[in-house]
Amino acid sequence: MDKNGIVLMRKYELGRLLGQGTFAKVYHARNIKTGESVAIKVIDKQKVAKVGLIDQIKREISVMRLVRHPHVVFLHEVMASKTKIYFAMEYVKGGELFDKVSKGKLKENIARKYFQQLIGAIDYCHSRGVYHRDLKPENLLLDENGDLKISDFGLSALRESKQQDGLLHTTCGTPAYVAPEVIGKKGYDGAKADVWSCGVVLYVLLAGFLPFHEQNLVEMYRKITKGEFKCPNWFPPEVKKLLSRILDPNPNSRIKIEKIMENSWFQKGFKKIETPKSPESHQIDSLISDVHAAFSVKPMSYNAFDLISSLSQGFDLSGLFEKEERSESKFTTKKDAKEIVSKFEEIATSSERFNLTKSDVGVKMEDKREGRKGHLAIDVEIFEVTNSFHMVEFKKSGGDTMEYKQFCDRELRPSLKDIVWKWQGNNNNSNNEKIEVIH
């Protein structure tokens, strides 16, 4: 549908579509009062809820308000309706850095400038307890002045996401840019993992291609974990030396960001940016109680985020998702769709109780026997998040609720344990872990 002419929240006139993904569309828009151009990210609540991405959206909001830096895309405000969430963000006109690199390698001074801006911004993020975890040229935008802006904080982690060992434990990021310790699925330091990704970005800017690139993913992972890469002969000696320290597969001996910033090659023409002073913690705390109420009282037009200039730890954004389903019947799995369907077929056959039919979105199980309120029927929907990561939701579509709950508790859920990665919802996850999706 053409959005031109639509006025959002009596404030923004939507223009052309800039891009879209599975769960969101981004439009160019104009602030009616000021005439300022912005980018409006429109997120479908139902779609993100169905695949368990609510926490990821909340995290993106939290991080974008927590981080204020000239080289990070600025979030003006967040608005919500019953079905959509709207991010009004800084409009970055120059497009993706990826588009620039796809045309070939950059000149050394240009590559250094982007790397300086990237490292400066990431250093600031780390000082705020934020780790990006998906740094790549596609997530680095350029403004009209040719300056870099970091975007897409959907996978980022806040300091409180660390477990008792002080490390992060969720595999995130794009394979070719991800650090070896992240691939190893052991605990990792988010700051050190970001440094590795920055090194891959620097290599790509100067070479025009990736340091680790194989058609075979296993072979690529092997090279990453061993730190096996070669620099082209046009790389300056000081860059080769710097990259050897950044792309060190041992995170403990890998160069730290402050040492990168002291490097002589990095220092050429580098101007450190003074960042705005963050509000005092007591100023934030005094406003937190008002924010959730603002969304529940007047979600259509009240901009809750004008109340605060930064978010504190533990802030609850559940008001954005007024009808979030706290279902006991969702789980994530690393099995493919065929294996998931096969498991439900096995359950139906072994119980000798259900007929099973396949549909475009999953399967339907129907009890051969008639219960208190007719035949018990269960719809199973399978949602692909990535090729190797699925969300499965099953729910009663007919019959008695008590019979459904008894069947789920005694037969269905125990039978699914060998394909379930994580159950969704507070009642199903004893560790109360957040589910983060691998891209």
Curated annotation (Swiss-Prot):
The keyword Manganese applies. InterPro entries: Kinase-like_dom_sf, NAF/FISL_domain, NAF_dom, Prot_kinase_dom, Protein_kinase_ATP_BS, Ser/Thr_kinase_AS. PROSITE patterns: NAF, PROTEIN_KINASE_ATP, PROTEIN_KINASE_DOM, PROTEIN_KINASE_ST. One of its GO terms (molecular function) is protein serine/threonine kinase activity. Autophosphorylated. It comes from the Eukaryota. The modification Phosphoserine is found at S156. It is an enzyme of class 2 (transferase). This is CBL-interacting serine/threonine-protein kinase 20. It comes from Arabidopsis thaliana (Mouse-ear cress).
